């Protein structure tokens, strides 16, 4: 009993012999069961084709990032803008409330002293305009002096050689003279403007001095009100400048957002245009036509040319008629026309002329014997075929 093994069910099986029940239990498993969860079919569906992978433009991701950044910046800056506007309105309301309270306590002295503080404001503005006019006048004087120096250099170059006149120095002299005239006009204009604003500033200062002497008592009593008003005015100007800056940032962010959207639209149009330009199906390799043969019609498939292409089309058309009694008259006429066209192409071929023997018969019997072996399959389908004779 050394050649027997003890089976799991108590049976003894000779060595080297398989148990039938084990083979039955371990039957062949289907390939679908080996793939967990049917991942084989899903992977082919979710995987992008090479054509789709080629159409993915990297500029899309870049423009989407710009779009997201601009959107986040717009949201953040708009929140800051709303907060700044709320703060500005709150300060404006508080300043108006405090000023009204202060004005009710002081009484009529505020209205009496108001011309004095208005004159001070105008005098301050006139003083600032005077400073700006002085800067413009100084700039015009500097330009005039530089232009005069250029004219002097050009005159020295022209007078260096008295025997001949250099056109380069002459052109430089003319240009320098024009600059001197323009600088002189600008200097005179700046001088007149400076004199005008200086007179206005002097008049404003004189008015301030006169009102200060006349309204000395009302000015002293209303000083707290106007000082508080000046403080609130400065605070409001700062918040107004902040609001204006935030509005400009929002406008710039919205401009970048619009540019990113426009770029995405252009990329999308380019992709659609490229898709419309591609063929719907990739064309396979085409076989070349025989030497001397013309290209077949568009209706014939790639690779079907000459006699084989025409006869192949005839066989397929004849086989599609089904197991009926036979093709009708129109079908036979079409097949005959295709056969004649293929024979004409064959006879026009240079290779065919080289293959013909010198003793070929004029009635085409030898040609018919050669082509009978290739056309034997469709003799039953197409009853009578025309024999075309070849004349050399």
From Swiss-Prot:
Residues 18-28 have a biased composition (Basic and acidic residues). GO terms for biological process: intracellular signal transduction. InterPro entries: SH3BP5 (IPR007940). The keyword Coiled coil applies. The keyword Coiled coil applies. It holds the Pfam family SH3BP5. Residues 317-332 have a biased composition (Low complexity). Residues 383-392 have a biased composition (Basic residues). Keywords: Coiled coil, Guanine-nucleotide releasing factor, Phosphoprotein. Residues 59-140, 169-272 form a coiled coil. The modification Phosphothreonine is found at residue 13. Residues 1-57, 275-332, 364-392 are annotated as: Disordered. The modification Phosphoserine is found at residues 30, 49, 342, 349, 357, 361, 377. One of its GO terms (molecular function) is guanyl-nucleotide exchange factor activity. Functions as a guanine nucleotide exchange factor (GEF) for RAB11A. Belongs to the SH3BP5 family. This is SH3 domain-binding protein 5-like. It comes from Mus musculus (Mouse). The lineage of its organism: Eukaryota, Metazoa, Chordata, Craniata, Vertebrata.
């Amino acid at each position: 009993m050394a050649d027997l093994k003890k089976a799991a069910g108590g049976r003894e099986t000779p060595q080297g012999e398989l148990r039938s029940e084990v083979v039955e239990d371990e039957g062949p498993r289907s390939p679908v069961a080996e793939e967990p969860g049917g991942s084989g079919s899903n992977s082919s569906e979710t995987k992008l084709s090479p054509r789709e992978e080629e159409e993915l433009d990297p500029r899309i991701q870049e423009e989407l990032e710009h779009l997201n950044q601009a959107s986040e910046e717009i949201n953040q800056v708009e929140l800051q803008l709303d907060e700044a506007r709320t703060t500005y309105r709150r300060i404006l309301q508080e300043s108006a409330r405090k000023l009204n309270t202060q004005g009710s306590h002081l009484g009529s002295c505020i209205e009496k002293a108001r011309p004095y503080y208005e004159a001070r404001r105008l005098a301050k503005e006139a003083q600032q305009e005077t400073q700006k006019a002085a800067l413009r006048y100084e700039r015009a004087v500097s330009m005039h002096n530089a232009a005069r120096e250029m004219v002097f250099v050009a005159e020295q170059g022209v007078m260096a050689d008295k025997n001949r006149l250099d056109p380069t120095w002459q052109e430089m002299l003319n240009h320098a003279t024009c600059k001197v005239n323009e600088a002189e006009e600008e200097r005179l204009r700046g001088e007149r403007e400076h004199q005008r604003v200086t007179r206005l500033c002097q008049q404003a200062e004189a008015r301030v001095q006169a009102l200060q002497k006349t309204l000395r008592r009302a000015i002293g009593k209303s000083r707290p009100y106007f000082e508080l008003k000046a403080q609130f005015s400065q605070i409001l100007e700062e918040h107004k400048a902040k609001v204006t800056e935030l509005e400009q940032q929002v406008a710039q962010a919205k401009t970048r957002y619009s540019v990113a959207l426009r770029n995405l639209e252009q990329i999308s149009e380019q992709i659609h245009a490229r898709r419309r330009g591609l063929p719907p199906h990739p064309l396979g390799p085409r076989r070349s036509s025989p030497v001397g043969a013309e290209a077949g019609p568009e209706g014939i498939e790639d690779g079907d040319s000459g006699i084989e292409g025409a006869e192949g089309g005839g066989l397929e058309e004849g086989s599609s008629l089904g197991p009926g009694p036979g093709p009708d008259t129109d079908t036979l006429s079409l097949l005959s026309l295709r056969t004649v066209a293929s024979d004409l192409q064959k006879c026009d071929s240079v290779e065919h002329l080289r293959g013909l023997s010198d003793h070929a018969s004029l009635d085409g019997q030898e040609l018919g014997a050669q082509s009978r072996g290739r056309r034997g399959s469709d003799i039953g389908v197409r009853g009578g075929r025309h024999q075309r004779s070849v004349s050399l």
